[in-house]
Amino acid sequence: MAKTLYEKVFDAHVVYEGKNELPILYIDRHLIHEVTSPQAFSGLKMAKRRMARADLTLATIDHDVSTKSVDLNACSDMAKEQITTLMQNTKEFGVRLLGLGDKNQGIVHIVSPELGFTLPGVTLVCGDSHTATHGAFGALAFGIGTSEVEHVMATQTLKQAKLKTMKIECKGQFQKGVYAKDLILYLIAQYGTAKGTGYAIEFCGELIRNLSMEARMTLCNMAIEFGAKVGMIAPDEITFEYIKGKEFAPKGEEFQKYCEYWKSLRSDEGAKYDESITLDVSKIKPQISYGTNPSQVIGIDEKIPKISDFKNQSEQKSLLDALSYVNLEQDQVIEGVKIDIVFIGSCTNGRLEDLKIAADILKGRKIHKNVKALIVPGSMQVRKEAENLGLDKIFIEAGCEWRYAGCSMCLGMNDDKANSGQRVASTSNRNFVGRQGKGSITHLMSPASAAACAIEGVICDNRKYLGV
């Protein structure tokens, strides 16, 4: 029977399936961080259990950490407590921790691929909603709750219902100034934040095959904003080249054997999906969010919708509520809206390729005098590689702040926050009410668009800086 990529990986990991019971999956990789792990470790201690496979668990510090310094004392009191607790727990249970000062510390969904801990065909979980990022490698990766974190720690297994499958085929090529971030924002804008609910989605097609691993991770990262639990891309030579030589990757002849197996991790010809979507990506323009959920997105040359554009009363109310919060109007042109802060980073767009894209636009230019711009590499490895290329100098000379690795302004859990009423051009993944600080206003966009906004101090078209 022909199978999809998702079905192949899922079926290969079922260790038990009783009558009228959910299948039990073996979990190959478990990522943990300081926010969703303390209760799980406490549960293990109370039950006097050890971890089933501490060697298949990797911990990092990312959500709470200060990006101004690698000194623990630079963090808030709550952050210090959570970080110290993780340090103690990982030491007690024998889990490798990428702690403050570690050359590999950074955002969980960036450091795992960097180290080759994420591999094609594995099952991977983390107490974080953006775990779908790792599906870019052909891994079956999804976020779990804290009680499930404890269960995986104790048993290295998890009960999981089998999801429906959706194919998203991307045809054509991007216009100049359009990136993977624009594609995923466009997809969510067209179909809504619930379209993927109950599905494992697979991105495929001509465009996907030509994307870098960084761009593929951006796509899969925001599968959750599309409503999907899982986003996957079949591994190929680009994947294998990215993995080769990394710390946890197979070595030598073993690597070649794995590559032969990984080549089988693609949907069979004739495999049936429960739903399919085909996109012509050549029509997509730089995308900007205008509201308070990731489906409220328009092209840079478009106007904010009018209430009459929606027939559904709940959508009409959502529009009015969003515009009231973000202080914008129906039928308003999005280009030219004043920006206070620019944030380039996060598990969506904090990789070296993202920083290169931003640096290409900022090189030789200055940011607007009324703009504060934070450039936050997703890991210390990204930071080092960027500095080796001189990107830090480009950012600093432009007037940006060059920070250490962490989740930073993606969420209001650390010191990097916007004040009430401040408008942020952000490369993160969510624009919810207060997401970047109480009363803050978020506009999601690509690193190129964010860099252009930093220069002009308003939402603008990045293509003018690319000779388009």
Swiss-Prot record:
Cofactor: [4Fe-4S] cluster
Primary enzyme class: lyase
Signal peptide residue numbers: none
Single annotated GO MF: metal ion binding
Binding residues annotated for [4Fe-4S] cluster, in chain numbering: 347, 407, 410
EC number per UniProt: 4.2.1.33
BP terms from Gene Ontology: L-leucine biosynthetic process
SUPFAM superfamilies to which the protein is assigned, alphabetical: Aconitase iron-sulfur domain (SSF53732)
Family matches, as Pfam families: Aconitase
Top-level taxon: Bacteria
Keywords noted in UniProt: 4Fe-4S, Amino-acid biosynthesis, Branched-chain amino acid biosynthesis, Iron, Iron-sulfur, Leucine biosynthesis, Lyase, Metal-binding
Pathway(s) where this gene product acts: Amino-acid biosynthesis; L-leucine biosynthesis; L-leucine from 3-methyl-2-oxobutanoate: step 2/4
Gene3D superfamilies for the chain: Aconitase, domain 3
Catalytic activity: (2R,3S)-3-isopropylmalate = (2S)-2-isopropylmalate
Role: Catalyzes the isomerization between 2-isopropylmalate and 3-isopropylmalate, via the formation of 2-isopropylmaleate.
Subunit and partners: Heterodimer of LeuC and LeuD.
Record-stated family: Belongs to the aconitase/IPM isomerase family. LeuC type 1 subfamily.
PANTHER family associated with the record: 3-ISOPROPYLMALATE DEHYDRATASE, HOMOACONITASE, MITOCHONDRIAL-RELATED
Name of the protein this chain belongs to: 3-isopropylmalate dehydratase large subunit
